[in-house]
A protein has these predicted regions:
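Extended, low-complexity regulatory regions
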Residues: 49-53
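Sequence-level motif detector for i,i+2 pairs with an aromatic at +2
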Residues: 1, 20-23, 59, 169
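Terminal beta-strand-rich extracellular "head" domains
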Residues: 28, 37-38, 43, 54-131, ...
Length: 179
């Protein structure tokens, strides 16, 4: 993980740095693979793929950018929530309607040979100078226990014709923006 921190930024003439400027950037790249099982109706909070940032001001905004490569063991809908300090804020979920799950992102896996790229972008206003931790929470709509994979597919082998067992990477980038 890389972190760039500064105590103060001023213009060359000594004036205050204008709003909207980048104050610090933190990134976490995941290059290895991982897997986890989720039972029917269950969820999984993936704290191994996470990044944290400590805002320098209560007026700062945090631009959250995630590129996730995700695979599954079956044809299913996968739902993902952006977790911030252990919970998903309403602003990071779709509107409610009946008993439908409120999610940050979702996709339908129609095959298990490849990885699905899931991009997530969210502008967070923490109103705090305490550390903010970001990770993902997963669920699916299958009536059975299913295996989920990060940075690999279900068909993880060297055989031809199945994407040759793709091994992509995933990344979280947190950018503090002066507010």
């Amino acid at each position: 993980m890389s972190t760039l921190k500064v105590n103060a930024i001023t213009e060359t003439d000594g004036s205050a740095f204008p709003l909207g400027k980048v104050l610090q950037v933190v990134s976490h790249s995941k290059n290895d693979t991982s897997s986890f099982s989720i039972s029917s109706g269950g969820t999984h909070d993936d704290t191994n793929f996470a990044a944290s940032i400590t805002p320098s001001s209560t007026s700062s905004k945090i631009l959250v950018q995630i590129m996730l490569n995700h695979g599954t063991s079956s044809n299913q809908i996968t739902g993902i929530r952006l977790m911030i300090n252990g919970s998903c804020p309403d602003a990071a979920k779709g509107n409610s309607s009946g008993s439908r799950a409120r999610l940050t992102a979702a996709y339908h896996a129609e095959e298990t040979a490849g990885c699905h790229v899931v991009p997530i972008t969210f502008l967070h206003s923490p109103n705090s100078t305490s550390q903010q931790t970001y990770n993902l929470n997963y669920r699916h709509n299958s009536g059975s226990t299913r295996t989920h994979y990060i940075n690999r597919s279900n068909d993880d082998n060297n055989a031809s014709g199945n994407g040759m067992g793709p091994r992509p990477m995933s990344i979280i980038i947190l950018t503090e923006i002066a507010g």
